[in-house]
Amino acid sequence: AYKLAKAQKDRKKTSYYKTLCEKIFAGNKAQYCQFDFDDNNENTGWFIYDDIMWWTISLARGYELFGVDEYLKLSEASFKRVWYGSEKVGDTGSYDKENGGMFWQWQPIQNPKPNKFGDGKMACINFPTVVAALTLYNNVPENRKESTDKRPDYQTKAQYLAKGKEIYEWGVENLLDKVTGKIADSRHGNGNPAWKAHVYNQATFIGASILLYKATGEKRYLDNAILAADYTVKDMSAEHKVLPFEGGIEQGIYTAIFAEYMAWLVYDCGQTQYLPFLKRTIKTGWANRDKTRNVCGGEYYKKLPEGAEIDSYSASGI
């Protein structure tokens, strides 16, 4: 909304959304241990890698929009926390330096044991890691010197790009069906991938692919993004001809994440063939909204009853 208002040179809306973003940041900082990523309190702290990595992405984007140094500092601190682990918490980090890819969690949350071969590597941490690394690549200074620390506080542009490429390739080899474009939910060791498709995982793979395409110009990344988008549109959305809904708290936001990365695919990469499907999804969901509140549900093909209880995640997609 801020970017749109700025592009339209609407000073009033630009100021409003900038202030709103600042309030959201301040509120979340107060809620989540002042963004101390080494605090593993299970109520207000950090206890799983993918949640931290989403803040890496959000904070890096905040820096990209507003140029606030604190956002970049916290974004890089959270990336370090996930990649290398925490000396305070005692986990060894999400990155598997022996076999590649990113582990999903540390266990137990208190006094954890090192991750081992066979522990889960989920799409929900691997592809967001690529998105985070490439977003930082796009925003850190050009002239940085490579740190010699074992657990560096920052990476150079080249290091962020290399890390993004490495994790992406692991994901392609282990989580992508190269024929259909379906993204597996996870893989444990050498076992078969868990071929349960989620709009969320399709979306982050699309986003990771586009960022690498824009950074390198290599067409294979764009081809992969199109393959995953086609599977989402033609296979996952076949029943109702609009984006599907997955029940459960938080899962309603999957389509909002998908929408963000599809906008990149359509407008930054010229793949306008998806516009009819996206417009149909929007039109269907909006037509079935609760018209008294102008609130949409997550099941776009169903009418939302007036006054029905709806979570913010499910309402966010349209």
Task: Briefly describe each language-model feature range.
Residues 1-50, 65, 85, 92-93, ...:
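CBM-like carbohydrate-recognition segments
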Residues 35, 46-61, 66-78, 82, ...:
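Mobile, glycine-rich extracellular loop/lid and propeptide segments
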Residues 1-13, 54-69, 128-155, 204-218, ...:
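Well-ordered alpha-helical scaffold segments within catalytic/enzyme domains
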Residues 52-55, 72, 126, 161, ...:
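Residue-level detector of extended alpha-helical repeat arrays and alpha-solenoid scaffolds
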Residues 72-170:
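Aromatic- and glycine-enriched pocket-lining scaffold segments that form the walls
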Residues 102-104, 183, 243:
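Short clusters of hydrophobic/aromatic residues that line enzyme substrate/ligand-binding pockets
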Residues 23, 27, 61, 74-88, ...:
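Alpha-helical scaffold segments in carbohydrate-active enzymes
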Residues 127-128, 132-196, 203, 208-211, ...:
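Noncatalytic carbohydrate-binding groove/subsite architecture in carbohydrate-active enzymes
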